[in-house]
Amino acid sequence: MRYADPSANRDLLGNRTLLFIFICAFALVTLLQQILYSKSYIKRYFEFYKEPLEFNSTRCLELRQEILEVKVLSMVKQSELFERWKSLQICKWAMDASEASLFKSTLSRCCNAPNFLFTTQKNTPVETNLRYEVESSGLYHIDQEIFKMFPKEMPYYRSQFKKCAVVGNGGILKNSGCGKEINSADFVFRCNLPPISGIYTTDVGEKTDVVTVNPSIIIDRFHKLEKWRRPFFSVLQRYENASVLLPAFYNVRNTLVSFRVKYMLDDFQSRQPVYFFHPQYLSSVSRYWLSLGVRARRISTGLILVTAALELCEEVHLFGFWAFPMNPSGFFITHHYYDNVKPKPGFHAMPSEIFTFLRMHSRGILRVHTGTCNCC
């Protein structure tokens, strides 16, 4: 007859007790962490209901530093970045004249938008062999006919405009009510023929001074303007007398279709000017942002326009620039304010670009709008 060993039962009971104590301790620590986090979150949440704080106040300097201490996007979780950005919204943004001036001086040395944003008769004389931005495309010879398409000189000069709005097409603009604030800017840049009339005007405004056109739009939607041209002309008319800007010298594929836009508007006796990005400017801008950590096969049109605006305008405001599937509050949004068509993967580095803008906002160089607007 076998007898159970009482000490074995005691050991088993002791092990279970230790396990129970460990589980309870772990649960208690987790609960305390949640309570402490909740207090911090609640504190930050209620800060949004106070009067806006001055951008250079002690609290705002702390919040700005929380953004600036993140050197690269991979350092923090997306949710943590959003939380830091939301907290900063209690601060009334103000331009830091010293930071902005320093940044603009570096752009002047590297890129020089007032002289090289567009091809002009001054910077691209007749008989020039103009190198494409994509160097493998070779050179384009500027003959007398093409030379006549160029303006005599750049139509804009350094810090010509007091306040500029660069309007991206992000879904963050939907239900923002930012239309009036965008319209109140002295100069407005837009990207790639976005819809601005009807249901969109309240959120995105309608004032447009420069609108870019990606030649792929003309190729895919308007059959290279080889046949019917009026549908494309009608689209451009929505922007009234806005200048039309194209990357004719990015590569060979873009050149002829970009020239056709100029020919078409001349045929219709339109007052809309047509300009072409200078490939030297595009190359310089790409190298500049690469040196600051924006690595992409090609930087976005939005980033190019922001770069130009920083030289041409005293104060730059960004609307519709957001590259995440959720807004800062964690709600899912569409990719564009007018559709949910995603870009080709791996072509642009949009999250990196937006992260760079958030850091520039925190430094007082430009302002990024990601919430609702209460203007005018």
Swiss-Prot record:
Involved in the synthesis of gangliosides GD1c, GT1a, GQ1b, GP1c and GT3 from GD1a, GT1b, GM1b and GD3 respectively. The chain crosses the membrane at residues 17-37. Keywords: Disulfide bond, Glycoprotein, Glycosyltransferase, Golgi apparatus, Lipid metabolism, Membrane, Signal-anchor, Transferase, Transmembrane, Transmembrane helix. The lineage of its organism: Eukaryota, Metazoa, Chordata, Craniata, Vertebrata. Expressed in liver. Its EC number is 2.4.99.-. GO terms for cellular component: Golgi membrane. Disulfide bonds join 164-313, 178-373. InterPro entries: Glyco_trans_29, Glycosyltr_29_Sialyltrsf, GT29-like_sf, Sialyl_trans. Glycans are attached at residues 56, 241. Belongs to the glycosyltransferase 29 family. It is found in: Golgi apparatus membrane. This is Alpha-2,8-sialyltransferase 8E. GO terms for biological process: glycosphingolipid biosynthetic process; N-glycan processing; oligosaccharide metabolic process; protein glycosylation. The active site is at residue 348. GO terms for molecular function: alpha-N-acetylneuraminate alpha-2,8-sialyltransferase activity; sialyltransferase activity. Substrate binds at residues 192, 214-216, 300-302. Its main location: Golgi. The keyword Metal-binding does not apply. Pathway: Protein modification; protein glycosylation. It catalyses: a ganglioside GT1b (d18:1(4E)) + CMP-N-acetyl-beta-neuraminate = a ganglioside GQ1b (d18:1(4E)) + CMP + H(+); a ganglioside GQ1c (d18:1(4E)) + CMP-N-acetyl-beta-neuraminate = a ganglioside GP1c (d18:1(4E)) + CMP + H(+); a ganglioside GD3 (d18:1(4E)) + CMP-N-acetyl-beta-neuraminate = a ganglioside GT3 (d18:1(4E)) + CMP + H(+); a ganglioside GD1a (d18:1(4E)) + CMP-N-acetyl-beta-neuraminate = a ganglioside GT1a (d18:1(4E)) + CMP + H(+). Signal peptide: none annotated.
